[in-house]
Amino acid sequence: NLASLNLIKFSKKNKKLDINAFEHACRLWTLTLEISVMMAQFPSKEIAQKSFDYRTLGLGYANIGGLLMSWGVPYDSDEGRAICSSISAIMTGISYATSAEIAKELGPFSKYKLNSKDMLRVIRNHKRAADGFKDGYDSLTINPVPLIKEDCPSEDLPNAASKAWEKALKDGEKFGYRNAQTTVIAPTGTIGLVMDCDTTGIEPDFAMVKFKKLAGGGYFKIINQVVP
C-alpha cells in the first residue's frame, strides 16, 4: 500500500516548488491509497485485520537528492535539510488533513476512539515542529528537530507546511482521521527507475554513473540526468 511522488516533476525555476501541484498530488494519492486498503491482498489474516482496523497508508516521495542537485543545494547543508523538512511536512500534513476530510464523510478508522487522545497529541507535536518551535512539546522526553524557516531559500515552503498542519489538526479535532498513519519514505529502488528518478528514496546520489546488477544476470548502466 505504497506510493511515491517524483519531486523533480514539481520543480520550478529559482529553487521553487510547485506547491499547489504537490499538495494536489498528495491529496489525490491519499484518497487513492485509502481506496486501495479494501482492494489489497495481505499475506496473513492478522495483517489484513490490522490493516482494516487502522487503515495505514504509505505515501512518500523520491528523488530529493536529484531535486537538490538541480537547485545547486548541497545535500548535507542547513538549506538542504530545511527544504527536505518543509517538503516532508507539507506531504504529511496535507495527507492527514485529507484523511480527516475522508473521516468526515466515512468516519475515522475503527480503532480511532481508543487512540484519539494519543493521535491528536502526535499531530499537535508535528504541528509545533512545523511551526519551528524548539520546545513546548507534549509528553516527549527528546524534543524533535524543528523546521528552521530561515534556512529555506523562500518562505513559501515553510509557510505551506505550517498551514498544512494547522488544517490537519483543526479538521482532525472535529472529525478524527480515516487513517492511523499516512506517510512513509520508501527506498523506491525499483519503482524509482520506472519513475525516471535520478536518486531513489531520500538518499543522495553516490555516483554520476552506476551499474545495477539484475536478478536474472547481467548489468545495466544508470546515468544521472540532472547534471548536464
Identify the meaning behind each predicted range.
Residues N1-P228:
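Long, C-terminal-biased catalytic regions of enzyme "large/alpha" subunits
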